[in-house]
UniProtKB/Swiss-Prot annotation:
GO terms for cellular component: cytoplasm. It catalyses: N-terminal L-lysyl-[protein] + L-leucyl-tRNA(Leu) = N-terminal L-leucyl-L-lysyl-[protein] + tRNA(Leu) + H(+); N-terminal L-arginyl-[protein] + L-leucyl-tRNA(Leu) = N-terminal L-leucyl-L-arginyl-[protein] + tRNA(Leu) + H(+); L-phenylalanyl-tRNA(Phe) + an N-terminal L-alpha-aminoacyl-[protein] = an N-terminal L-phenylalanyl-L-alpha-aminoacyl-[protein] + tRNA(Phe). Pfam families: Leu_Phe_trans. InterPro entries: Acyl_CoA_acyltransferase, Leu/Phe-tRNA_Trfase, Leu/Phe-tRNA_Trfase_C, Leu/Phe-tRNA_Trfase_N. This is Leucyl/phenylalanyl-tRNA--protein transferase. Its EC number is 2.3.2.6.
Amino acid sequence: MAYDSDYTFPDPETSDKQGLLAIGGVLTPKRVLQAYSQGIFPWYEPGNPVLWWSPNPRLILIPNEFKISRSLKKTLKKPFKLTVDTAFQRVISYCATCSDRTNKTWITSEMIETYTQLHEMGYAHSFEIWDGSELVGGLYGISLGHAFFGESMFHTITDASKVALHFLCSIMQSWNFDFIDCQLPTLHLMRLGAKIISRKEFLHMLQETLKYPDKKGNWSVD
């Protein structure tokens, strides 16, 4: 399925050693969806052109392979309130100030605007963790087919982002989703069960999962 019929990205296999595939262009919702459908994602710093990446290797998390440590097991017993798609703009704004990739803010105002539009279109979703009335953790990403493409997560109290990821995995497993794309390998996510695969394998898995219809709309859980 072509999400942006006016533009097609280069073959991901032609990216450089760091995974950089293309530079520039406009960050529109349709173009972002087209990128994800080809195993590509935007990642760039404020003031710079849009950079489009397709790294090799790739990090994914199979929903039923999430690992729960002893400390996280204790945290999961706390009376958090778990919600989906009730505070998307707050979650992405928190992530913009609590970026996990670098110490710099990479979630630009342009990205916030585009992903908020994707949320309104039913493609971008947020998972929220509440301690009473306080938003203490969460994550957001894109859903296509039976795949969830994680973008960023945040926490204001210890392990709240891990609670959000566990929540995501539980929902994805119940909906028979195939994998969560974690993009770049990190020890933090690998300790939680994520695994490294080749780009070739990732692209094959992606094309298989895109055979399923997109689960669009405002998500909710009981």
